[in-house]
C-alpha cells in the first residue's frame, strides 16, 4: 500500500496600492513563500520576474485608487499567484512581449476580464502557476 503525504495548502493574501513602488513588497512575499517550500533559486528568480511582469501589467491597467490584490497559494510543488485590479481599460486584446515573457517564465498563465461593480469598470484578473521541478 502506498502512503501519500502532502503538505497542506498555504494561502497568503496581500492588498497594496496599485503603484510600481509596491512591487518590491509583492516580490518579497513571493520569494519568501517559494523559498520556504523548497523551490530552486532559478525557479524563485522566474517567480520574481513573473511577479514583476504581472504587477506592471495590472498597475498599468488599474483605475486610479484601485488596490492591487494578490493571493499566493503554495500547495505541493505548485506556486499559484492570482492578482486582480479594477480597471476602465482591461487587459490588451493581443498581449505582446510582456505576456510572452510571462509565459516563458511560468508553466501556465490565466487571465480574465469581468464586468466590475460600477458602470464601465472591469475586474481584471491575471494568475500564473509555477511548478517546482527539483529540490534544493
Show where each model-derived region lies.
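Bergerat-fold GHKL ATPase/HATPase_c domain
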Residues: 1-49
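Conserved ATP-binding N-box helix of the HATPase_c
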Residues: 40-65
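Conserved beta-strand-loop-beta-strand hairpin that lines the nucleotide-binding pocket
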Residues: 1-13, 57-136
